[in-house]
Design a protein with these regions (language model features):
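Histidine-/acidic-rich catalytic cores in large beta-rich domains
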Residues: 4-314
Length: 314
């Protein structure tokens, strides 16, 4: 069967509970048919909690997706209660509280998996009920907190993680400001973990930041999540891509394809690097590494995708 056509959009003239009409920002998912008719809607302002600010208040004010502000790079974002409506960090419908940047479809139960840059990774059913949430536990209301996946090790033992997502005696880590939360051909979840706001804070030095390609195994019946593969942490700040980016598992080659789209973004005068990688899944050997340079300093690349012409045109 053909996959549904799913789009992330904002909604014009959205009426809030206080009667104010706003234009929402990246917090609506719609399904359209081939004629473009809307056949279903996931309104995240009702499904999630648009007032949760646990990660929003820990972000680097220098870059939020393609909005780059070098004057505030390295500074922790400040959330103001009277932030104007529009494409700005803030809570509530009409501000950039969710920032959905990918949608995956899980055919086995007719559900979607969204990457919400400012909240976490969330699976939602056709009935608009949250199935699970992959994110640190801080700030979720009682109903949504019950949907949080519990981190475990390879033997199924619970890991000890605090509300900010910091876990003891383990390589497990949550994703922060992530992109492309996609299902692999193995049924696992692969994510580009950008890593801004890691541990719901800004580090003492900006150069302590890092990004990862990461893979999780989720047991929906038990409500657990196990980290089974990662790459990039060991490469440190030189591999750090604060915004955009993508990874995708390649079954035919048993490799992880990845693209860090914003390396060196905050380095004044330096070209921003878009780093294309193919990493051997078993050995983590770098099979391919290509640096794509931007023609303008401090401007980001967005994504790189693998194209299979024979499949496209057959």
């Amino acid at each position: 069967d053909a996959l549904p056509i799913l789009l992330r959009v904002g909604k014009r003239d959205y009426r809030k509970e206080d009667g104010i009409h706003v234009q929402t920002i990246r917090d609506q998912i719609i399904e359209v048919d081939k004629s473009g008719r809307v056949v279903d809607v996931w309104d995240l302002t009702k499904i999630l909690d648009p007032m949760r600010d646990a990660l929003l208040g820990a972000l680097d004010a220098g870059a939020v997706c393609v909005n780059v502000d070098l004057a505030h790079a390295g500074q922790q974002a400040k959330l103001e209660p009277d932030t104007p409506y529009g494409d700005a960090l803030g809570v509530g419908a009409g501000r950039n509280w969710a920032h959905v940047n990918s949608i995956a479809f899980d055919a086995k139960d007719d559900a979607i998996i969204i990457s919400s840059r400012h909240q976490g990774v969330v699976k939602i059913g056709r009935d608009k009920q949250v199935k699970w949430i992959l994110a640190p536990s801080k700030g979720w209301n009682k109903a949504l907190a019950s949907k949080l996946l519990k981190p475990v090790d390879d033997k199924g033992n619970a890991l000890k993680c605090d509300e900010n997502g910091k876990c003891e005696n383990t390589d497990f880590d949550f994703t922060y400001t992530q992109h492309t939360a996609w299902l692999s051909s193995k049924g696992t979840l692969t994510i580009f973990d950008n890593g801004d706001g890691r541990g719901l804070e800004q580090p003492a030095l900006p150069t302590m930041k890092y990004s990862r390609f990461v893979e999780y195994k989720i047991d929906e019946k038990k409500g657990t999540v196990q980290q089974i593969w990662e790459y990039g942490k060991e490469r440190g700040y030189d591999f750090y891509s604060p915004i955009t980016s993508v990874i995708e598992y390649q079954k035919d080659r048993d490799t992880m394809f990845g693209f860090g789209g914003s390396i060196n973004l905050f380095d004044v005068g330096q070209p921003t690097i878009g780093k294309i990688n193919e990493i051997d899944y078993k050995t983590k050997e770098v099979k391919v590494e290509i640096n794509v340079l931007s023609d303008k300093p401090n401007q980001t690349h967005y994504r790189a995708l693998l194209v299979h012409p024979r499949q496209m045109f057959k």
